[in-house]
Amino acid sequence: MNNSKTNQQMNTSMGYPLTVYDECNKFQLIVPTLDANIMLWCIGQLSLLNDSNGCKHLFWQPNDKSNVRILLNNYDYGHLFKYLQCQRKCSVYIGEGTLKKYNLTISTSFDNFLDLTPSEEKESLCREDAHEDPVSPKAGSEEEISPNSTSNVVVSRECLDNFMKQLLKLEESLNKLELEQKVTNKEPNHRISGTIDIPEDRSELVNFFTELKTVKQLEDVFQRYHDYERLSQECDSKTEIASDHSKKETKIEVEPPNERSLQITMDQRDNSLYFQLFNNTNSVLAGNCKLKFTDAGDKPTTQIIDMGPHEIGIKEYKEYRYFPYALDLEAGSTIEIENQYGEVIFLGKYGSSPMINLRPPSRLSAESLQASQEPFYSFQIDTLPELDDSSIISTSISLSYDGDDNEKALTWEEL
């Protein structure tokens, strides 16, 4: 083990071993440093490889692989240098004819190197044994390679696709260049001449066409006319689109009333009147509002209830209980909710169903509705006095008859 490590250190200090193949020879090189220019110079020093930097491509592979990669730029050389630094044996092949001779496949830098099959390994060993005897330069020069010697080189599918993409781009560029040359070099086969008599009273036309002296000026007029036609068509199309949008907007249905309503469910039991309020609007119902309930009997009674400082959020419930209340509920009773400014912001009537939808009255101004729906931010919980479990939030309500001065005090509590 110590001897092998010592040999590796000696090889690294002396250089990096590299096997070089051409169509007739095999050479063992020691590259002193990992530099592309120095490696090319070392390969070019061989008498039979003096054209390796010129007309022939260089390919490389780790030993015992069946495909090779081309050496074109620093990126490709960098991959080769990583293998050499790891003390892996690598080979360099010169020219496509050498690849055909050794039956090697060209791959891109994104493909993996493929291992040799057992049959290919035997053939590789036989070829290496055959190359142990040096071949004279004359023998190599006598073998001429036909122009189609690289026609049977195997190329990977990905590499072939890249070649096809480059060929398509080249074809498009050539077609575009040819079309531009035809347009610039096009000459009219014949000239059209003629005269148009313009009446003298059309002074604007006379002055306009008098200024046209060259064919270029006439082409400019023609081009401007076509630009005007194109812009006119675009404006017409935009006008049609705008009209279509306006038609669609007229067909938009108005939101159903239930989307802007307060839902109140009423229930009467145990000499008490229960109100369950659900905020089904799109805004928060502010605090400090009042609920007015008016009977529909012969002698209507109006109850004014302070709803307290708490706001009611969107899609939130709140329940109230008012007692004592011994009257019977009749259809036609009115429920109103007033804001802190005394304006009615929601209105509805009690019918056969216990659920009532309160909606904003049509006479209510937008400013009043907005002011009533502003959230009550000045209220703070920490300002309330501490209460025990038996405490009840209550206030007084007035019960009055129309035309009668008698009043009866009621109380309410909030659950």
Swiss-Prot record:
Residues 254-367 are annotated as: AMS1-binding. It is a peripheral membrane protein. It holds the Pfam family ATG19. One of its GO terms (biological process) is autophagy. Residues 21-28 are annotated as: ATG11-binding. Gene3D superfamilies: 2.60.40.2830. GO terms for cellular component: phagophore assembly site membrane. InterPro entries: Atg19/Atg34_C. There is a cross-link at residues 213, 216 (Glycyl lysine isopeptide (Lys-Gly) (interchain with G-Cter in ubiquitin)). A motif (WXXL) lies at residues 412-415. Residues 126-150 are annotated as: Disordered. Its main location: membrane. Cargo-receptor protein involved in the cytoplasm to vacuole transport (Cvt) and in autophagy. Recognizes cargo proteins, such as APE4, LAP3, LAP4 and AMS1 and delivers them to the pre-autophagosomal structure for eventual engulfment by the autophagosome and targeting to the vacuole. Involved in the organization of the preautophagosomal structure (PAS). ATG19 association with cargo protein is required to localize ATG11 to the PAS. Interacts with the vacuolar aminopeptidase 1 (LAP4) precursor and mature forms. Also interacts with AMS1, APE4, ATG8 ATG11, and UBP3. This is Autophagy-related protein 19. It comes from Saccharomyces cerevisiae (strain YJM789).
